[in-house]
């Protein structure tokens, strides 16, 4: 019988982080991955002479020398992964464009608190004090989350009330509530709401904590990408895991989580059965409950929670390799958010329907990393997040034509908004729909972001309930559906938190 201290199922960002934390602590850990590569969607793929980044737009919480962020401390310093981080030039450019090509607004925001504040004052005068208060709130919320993480999910309420009162106040409110309370003007709110499409939840329902952490970290510490795509990150974490003594099985599918007396005790795989007293599942709990866990051991609370939650962000992505350089095409921006500029609640409803694409996050990787592809070329991606399972209604016979139609719509939108011609120079193109992500990453409806961090299921509620939300003995969940929410940074930080929680339980068990 093969027995481990812990088994981690899934080598995505969260699973790799949990595995590294456990293995570095000296535990015997097995990492199981169904594919032949680590990373899940944190990877790359090749078409022709181009290697495309699969998912990452930019990473926060890296920071600069002397002021490193949480992700740099975790990945580079704690796990010892030698990644060279490349800074993204600006925070973002946003273009609000109508169907006829009329541009309503076009603004570019920089990194850095002071620079951001100055530029905000240029675009929306009278908001300097509001931005300053926003950052006071960000600092407090970040410190509060760090405290909760250090307490392994069991923070002292007295400490929170005394040291982080505003964190408790804003946790149940939306970003729009917070911006209104801080007295941002309407123009400033529109600028501050640009990142909503990253989360695929409108500014009236999104968790204010998630929003504060994302915007605050990106403005404060800047945004970064890896020199060699996110495949470099996940293979580096895998190497660290093995260096810590961990064992990994690839091309092996987990088929069932085993239980004894109501406690998880092992995993049945396509290569046999392995045992451990602690199982970490890097994936959506709904998938585990539906396919991997015997119904009799799932508490009623967990079933109700899973059914009450709402899947988030079903991704549609177009990847293109062009046979011209960014300079030749006149492309100067790394990251452009293109939309009609509607209220975010209206935008959210619109992306819940299968209609003409009017919004996208467009990236040109060569602007940040000129050496990412072959000489004389550049590569781009265009992402749209659907708020509902509209692709689930597509008939198989219509799928290819619809996919290609939507790809053309998103490319024409970019050309219309930026007045830049790219379609004639496309050498390679690949299109990923929610079906693609559902198949590859085994996520319901293609929702790679897990659950919407909104309303009652907000980030603060999840973090405050860490010690109560894992009710199945021996089984914990990590990744984008975890307590800190979605995204590369949050998945890795969640993985570390879950790993530490398992270590805490092992210590109590005398292991």
Can you annotate each of these PLM segments?
Residues 212-264, 269-270:
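Helical element adjacent to the flavin cofactor pocket in flavoenzyme catalytic cores
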Residues 259, 504-511:
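Active-site-proximal substrate-binding core of FAD-dependent oxidoreductases
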Residues 325-435:
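C-terminal segments that line or cap access tunnels to active or ligand-binding sites in enzymes
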Residues 255-374:
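Mid-domain catalytic core of redox enzymes
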Residues 100-206:
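Rossmann-like flavin
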Residues 2-140:
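N-terminal glycine-rich phosphate/pyrophosphate-binding loop and immediately adjacent elements
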Residues 56, 480-502:
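A conserved FAD-binding loop/helix module that cradles the flavin
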Residues 185, 189-199, 357-363, 420-484:
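A glycine-rich dinucleotide-binding beta-alpha-beta segment and adjacent secondary-structure elements
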